[in-house]
Amino acid sequence: MEFNLDNFRLRKYSKITKKILALGKKYQTLTDDQLRIKTETLRNKLVKGASLDSILIEAYATIREADFRVLGLKPFENQVLGAVVLHYGNVAQMNTGEGKTLTATMPLYLNGLTGPGNFLVTVNSYLANRDAEEIGKVYKWMGLTCASGVSLDDEELDKKAIYQNDIVYTTNSELGFDYLTDNLVDNINKKKLNDLNFALVDEVDSVLLDLAQTPLVISGAPRVQSNLFVSTDRIVKSLKPNVDFEFSEDLKDVWFTQTGIEQLEEYLGIQGLISDKWSDFYRHLVLALKANYVMKRNQDYIVTNREVLLLDSENGRALTGMKLEAGIHQAIEAKEEVELSDQTRSMASITLQNFFKMFRKLSGMTGTAKSSAREFLEVYNLPVLKIPTHKPNIRIDHADVVFATMDEKIEATVRMVKAAYQIKRPVLLKTGSLSLSRLYSRVLLEHGIVHNVLNAQSESKEAMIVASAGKSGAITVATSMAGRGTDIKLGKGVKEKGGLLVIGTERMDSRRVDDQLRGRAGRQGDPGESIFLVSLDDKVVIENAPDWVEKYRLKLEQAVEQGKRKYGAPLKGRRARKIVEKAQQAADSAAEESRKNAVKMDDILRIQRELIYDFRDYIMKSTDLTTMVQQIKNDYFNAIARENKKDAGKLLDFIINNVDYNYMDNDFNPEILESTADIKQYLEEIARNRWSQQQMIVNNKFKQNYLERLAVLKALDVAWIEQVDNLQQLKTVVTSRSSGQHNPVFEYEKEAMHSFEQMKKLFWKNTVKYMLLSELIPGKNGSVRVEFP
């Protein structure tokens, strides 16, 4: 008999679940005060050394009863099992409508007993606020503190106070950006986040997989605007696909071929296009290539009022105010011939993978994770366990219906929607892009079918539309998986008509995303149906199927013209379905590989980031940095002495610009240029004299320490911002080199290490410069204002 680890784990967790349920009757007899005092009792046990595991059964039984008394809802056995699974650091796959929100109360309460640092993370600000308000009542009733970490009306929140709560409901981006901004403060007391103890991620596949390649980036420090975007755009538009450049299998990456590079060198009249000399120009060519051939209008972005607006890949919503980093946004603007926006530097960056790996404990919930179980385990060490449903799932999932062309598919889709509309059966119709949702909407209107279109809505309005999508006669057109996290409840009389009909108009790049769509129907034992109507010219097929499929499709079209095949007839047999399935598998594999590369690249940045952030904290906590500053000066003057040996002009220029503005070279003895030690000694003497002048203004040890801390911190931040920005630019370039000739991760690591060494020198230089050349302005009350050069 084969051993099944998942079943073993579920049996283990089921035993714990039964013990929790067994306490149910006992806890029902407790008065409110007796139940609420349990929080203090459990906390006292933790103080005395008890583990969370040892108090889990009692804690879960307590909060389960509290859920009923405050919300009128008592978690079912499957929800309690899901909650146990979550506590032990797993992903719980729970179908739509199985009550993930209530399930989360148990692990959050248990971990909340330890104090601040526990988070329910979602992608949706509206849901985070809603659940913090509604579900938060339970925690507060039980004596814990709970708050929302997001604002819906741009109200300024006191994040430091919010993160002192035992439990915080927030979004992945809000939490990640707060972590990054914490590492830009100049005083340790200004940090908002103190502890990253437990993160329970709702829709975990969306956060940790679908959004994994999009790093959180804080931008600032404007760059000097480049004039190369327009010229490189024109050059790239003249190149030939598959000759001068070629695509990855999923068409999501593109790079120049050797032929293309040679053509460009000949056209530009240069040699060594990919050498350091032409690196900036080459980077702009790469950006123009991506903008023109990878980024698609009305799929990745829209142009409105002569402005490029990004689109949310999850729901098609326009992301006002957000821009792509590393110059790609400006390259798209050049492509679309609109005014170029200001280009900014990346000041801080982290991917969601590496951010959530920082938590002591991580778990997640979703309706669709099993198909990505291997990736969850390999990348996050998160096993995926499927939780049984409370009621049997009776949804009917039909096999795909495949058509030769999109036109045939659209007509069949409209016929199916019309048939459901006539009997007032609700339909959820999912499209793959904003432009396609508009197309289907227009066709439905032409047939007199009243419907809602779910794209670019506010999150609150989106939730309302989704919630009503199960009502009699409701037809809802949605882009991708808009409205996740909101249940579709069936209206009166809908069960008798077969429940919600879910129609997918194309296969997405991942089977998991299609499973999410199917999961919208058949909640909590309700009837429902799902079906995908697909065609051989759908995006996933065009981008991932072999070349012969296009010839096969053209042959089918010709058969219609010759009267050998009936127009609109679905393709019979498994061959057509296999084409679509294999194309989707290829897309899914390519996306997984791309995510793995993104993890590897960010791991390289993570090592540097952790070193810098730990060093930053050390600087802010230190009361005396004199020894460190002296060591920095020593290392830097050593390097300068070696670099400027036998070059009086460069040495004197360095002194005036970095050590003493007022330096006079009357006493300069050219003989010192023969010895590195003599140059270093000479630099140290000038630095001592200059520091003596500064000490006359900062005339006590406290002020000197303050200046040292400010100078070192400022120098570190300037150097690190330069490094982060360099690595963002570097990532763009190395991922666009032909994969046959280069390993992008290896190239990135090699160049990132070299860049880090350059960053250290910049840090040394600026520390010395800020210490010696800052203008110190005494105040009337004995204070000193520092103005850095």
Curated annotation (Swiss-Prot):
InterPro entries found in the cross-reference section: Helicase_ATP-bd, Helicase_C-like, P-loop_NTPase, SecA, SecA2, SecA_DEAD, SecA_motor_DEAD, SecA_preprotein_X-link_dom
Cell compartments where the protein resides: Cell membrane; Cytoplasm
Keywords attached to this entry: ATP-binding, Cell membrane, Cytoplasm, Membrane, Nucleotide-binding, Protein transport, Translocase, Translocation, Transport
Positions with a binding annotation for ATP: Q79, G97, E98, G99, K100, T101, D487
Gene Ontology CC terms: cell envelope Sec protein transport complex; cytosol; plasma membrane
EC number(s) recorded for this UniProt protein: 7.4.2.8
PROSITE patterns cross-referenced by the UniProt entry: SECA_MOTOR_DEAD
GO MF assignments: ATP binding; protein-exporting ATPase activity
General function of this protein: Part of the Sec protein translocase complex. Interacts with the SecYEG preprotein conducting channel. Has a central role in coupling the hydrolysis of ATP to the transfer of proteins into and across the cell membrane, serving as an ATP-driven molecular motor driving the stepwise translocation of polypeptide chains across the membrane.
Assembly information from the UniProt record: Monomer and homodimer. Part of the essential Sec protein translocation apparatus which comprises SecA, SecYEG and auxiliary proteins SecDF. Other proteins may also be involved.
Protein known as: Protein translocase subunit SecA 2
Organism for this UniProt entry: Pediococcus pentosaceus (strain ATCC 25745 / CCUG 21536 / LMG 10740 / 183-1w)
Gene that specifies this protein: secA2
